[in-house]
Amino acid sequence: MIHYLFDGSYYGLLTAVFESFERKNFNVNIAEKDYFLGSMFDETVEIITDTEKAKRVLDGLKKKLKSQDFQKIYCAFLSEDQKARNAIFYIIQQLFKGQDAILDNFGDDQILYYHQTLKKVNREKHRMKAFIRFQISN
């Protein structure tokens, strides 16, 4: 298996998506290079963040997704969950391959994990808002 190592930034993830299409490598795993524990038999490719490539992917996502779904992808990225980042990578790849209704396919394990991560992030956001409200009222 091929592993794409990126710096952990959102633009780094989007650059990895661009690179996967450029190199025609679709069955890849992405990981942050600081936390990656490699295997002797796996190939690793270090992805250097390129804002131009990332912006091209962002522009394509804006055209393919509703603004709400576009924001949800970034929200799931903020979870800092490695498996969720792989799910986001997979979702973006499928969107650019032409599967426009990919986010509604709950039969796919990657999509299901993505939605579960979104739910976790939104729950944490709600708790933080409640905590801040509680602090302000005192």
Q: What is each stretch, according to the model?
A:
Residues 5, 44, 48, 79, ...:
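Generic amphipathic alpha-helical segments used as scaffolds and interaction surfaces in large
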Residues 16-22, 52, 75-81, 115-123:
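Phosphate-binding glycine-rich loops and adjacent basic patches that engage nucleotide phosphates
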